[in-house]
A protein has these predicted regions:
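Short, Lys/Arg-enriched N-terminal segments with co-localized hydrophobic residues
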Residues: 2-14
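Active-site-proximal alpha-helix that buttresses catalytic centers in soluble enzyme cores
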Residues: 16-179
Length: 179
């Protein structure tokens, strides 16, 4: 037999009969699913890698060094030396679909959307880089989603991955004043 997800519902399926007699049918609230991955530069170029590294390495969950000490190291040394070297490495794995991490995450979101159908709106986001977490949360809200299920795609919990993503999500929701 097939496994039925609790998210999967027919378009005509309504909320349980807790409504008064004669009340018109009420569709279930729209659910959004957000797959979150770490991130990738927008392109395998030194400028794009620099933007990505600045965002990634500025996260206090990733680098737990006092800001006063870390800022000159990041901006004076790392962001002036690593982007060119890292861009070369990204060029070696970049495909016609972009970064492998972005292409795979996009494919996972598309497959999940196909599986869930109209029962949910599935989007994908990167903690660092694009598509940006905040933009995708806004897209889910704009699509009428009243609930968002967030699925970090990291293989295990870590403060630098899962916690950082959930921190960013919480900050985005607070900025939107969405509860």
């Amino acid at each position: 037999g097939s496994i039925r997800s609790p998210l999967v519902q027919e378009k005509s399926e309504i909320m349980p009969a807790v409504l008064p007699a004669g009340h018109p049918p009420v569709l279930r609230p729209r659910v959004g699913v957000l797959l979150v991955n770490l991130g990738t530069p927008d392109a395998p170029t030194p400028a794009a890698v620099r933007r990505y590294l600045k965002q990634f390495l500025s996260d206090p969950r990733v680098v737990e060094i006092p800001r006063l000490v870390w800022w000159p190291i990041l901006n004076g040394i790392i962001l002036n030396t690593r982007p060119k070297k890292s861009a070369h490495a990204y060029q070696q794995v970049w495909t016609e679909h972009g970064s492998p991490l972005a292409a795979i995450t996009r494919a996972q979101a598309e497959a999940l959307q196909e599986r869930l159908g109209d029962a949910a709106t599935v989007r994908w986001a990167m903690r660092y880089g694009n598509p940006a977490l905040g933009a995708e949360v806004q897209a889910l809200k704009d699509a009428g989603c009243e609930r968002i299920l967030v699925a970090p795609l990291y293989p295990q919990y870590s403060g630098a991955t899962t916690a950082s993503s959930l921190d960013a999500l919480g900050a985005q929701l607070a900025a939107m004043r969405w509860q």
